[in-house]
Regions:
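N-terminal periplasmic "start-of-domain" segments of outer-membrane beta-barrel proteins
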Residues: 2-28, 34, 86-91, 141
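Short loop/turn motifs at secondary-structure junctions and domain boundaries
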Residues: 11, 65-68
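Surface-exposed loop and edge beta-strand positions of immunoglobulin-like domains
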Residues: 23-26, 67, 100
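Surface-exposed beta-strand-turn/loop segments characteristic
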Residues: 35-41, 45-61, 69, 81-210
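Conserved catalytic motifs of the protein kinase core domain
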Residues: 73
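Short aromatic-centered micro-motifs
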Residues: 76
């Protein structure tokens, strides 16, 4: 369990851990890690919007903001190890780990330490810790192909990915790849963005008729 070397349930002790397992991930139909992040109960204020008008330099990237304390206050681990931060910065200038760099098909589960853990991990874990556990022991081959369509407009997500793994001696070798092709959707196709006027510059520049 994240934050402890002692075996026990996810609710043992004063710092409970929320776990999103592989079965839940598949039930969500998640195409990116951002889709999983939205289901973390204490996530608040992360910049996971694919809209270029609202996301700025973080378009296509994913991050976690536990309890709304800032991206730099949430520690992101991959298999219990720290990861490098993204080249882009958030709208407030803070740095973060791009979790969308992890293929969904390679993810075993997500462990979220929902309370501050600065005493264990340092000041960058003031809000908590998110640990992405990969399918390191996977053997065989798995391929996924899916298509999702938005309720509004004509936007579609086409996803393809694979994972292969083999065991050689005492070592496991796993290779995973995932690609998401998301078609654009104009603001005019969404009713709340197209009320009483129209604009090609996004909702911020909506023009109202006289």
């Amino acid at each position: 369990v994240t934050g402890s070397y002692i075996k026990g349930s996810a609710t043992d002790g004063s710092s409970p851990v929320q776990i999103i397992g592989r079965e839940t991930i598949e039930d969500l139909g998640a195409t990116t890690i951002a889709d999983i992040t939205r289901n973390i109960s204490v996530n608040n204020g992360s910049e996971n919007n694919p809209d270029s008008f609202q996301s700025g330099s973080t378009q296509g990237l994913s991050n976690v903001n536990l309890r709304g304390l800032g991206l730099s206050s949430t520690l992101v681990l991959v298999d219990g190890k720290r990861n490098t931060v993204a080249a882009a910065t958030a709208n407030d200038g803070s740095v973060f780990v791009d979790t969308n760099s992890i293929p969904v098909i390679a993810l075993e589960r997500v462990e979220v330490l929902t309370e501050g853990a600065a005493s264990v991990y340092g000041s960058d874990a003031v809000a908590g810790v998110v640990n992405y556990i990969l399918r390191r022991d996977f053997t065989g081959a798995e391929v996924v192909v899916s298509q999702q369509e938005a309720d509004l407009g004509s936007q579609t997500d086409n996803r393809a990915g694979f994972i292969v793994g083999t065991e050689i001696g005492n070592n496991n070798f796993v290779l995973a790849y995932s690609k998401l092709d998301r078609s654009p959707i104009p603001g005019t196709a969404i009713s709340q963005y197209n009320q009483f006027g129209s604009s090609g510059f996004g909702n911020s520049f909506l023009v109202f008729p006289p």
